[in-house]
Amino acid sequence: MSFGRDSYHHGNLREALVEAARRLIAERGLGGFAFAELARAAGVSPAAPYRHFRDRNALLAELARRGFERLTADLTAAWNEGRPDPAVAVERCGRAYLAFAGRDPASYAAMFDGNPGDTDPALRSAADAAFAVIRRAADAACAAAAGPGRPPALMVALHVWTLCHGTASLFTGPPSPGRRPLPMEPEDLLEAGLLVYLRSLGLGR
């Protein structure tokens, strides 16, 4: 598979490499992504990718960073649409998270399974920004559910993230022996989980 040399000749090699990596991962998973094959897919020489990325992990970090930035934008829009009702805002953030994972499973895989390390400050900052939106929603939920026995806001944010990430992981990515068919849509599964959790906090329908 080749995406041609046009991008390279027009000085857009970096963008062509990121897009080629995203397509390869979407087709084969992270295990099917190698630098040499990436060069072939982008239609350039084996040495060309190193002009922009020092190695495979650096390219994965760039793909992940871009993914987190888009996820942050999606979560922020969902949060703004759901306010002022904190339960609605949390639910919409969850749906936005799930929609992102389903729409771009390759970037999602790079974000959470790519193992680029913690040495890229831009990637860490982008990941923190995405979680900050979930934390903001959790803060609002906790403020509305103030009372004895309520978990701290950080724990609520982690619980919500766990529900979102766990549901997305069950439904995205290439087939694997450990994945089993589920008798429901991912949105329904996530909505039910969030509803049960929010009710335990005294929120929700």
Annotate the PLM regions.
Residues 16, 20, 24-58:
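Helix-turn-helix
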Residues 76-107, 128, 147-160:
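Hydrophobic alpha-helical connector segments
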Residues 16, 25, 60-67, 111, ...:
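Alpha-helical DNA-contacting segments of helix-turn-helix folds
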Residues 92, 99-136, 178-183:
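Short secondary-structure transition hinges
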Residues 13-22, 38, 63-71, 75, ...:
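Generic hydrophobic, amphipathic alpha-helix propensity
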Residues 1-12, 173-175, 179, 205:
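N-terminal intrinsically disordered/low-complexity leader segments
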Residues 119-143, 154-158, 184-199:
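Amphipathic alpha-helical packing segments from all-alpha helical-bundle domains
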Residues 20-27, 70-82, 163-170:
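Solvent-exposed, amphipathic alpha-helical segments
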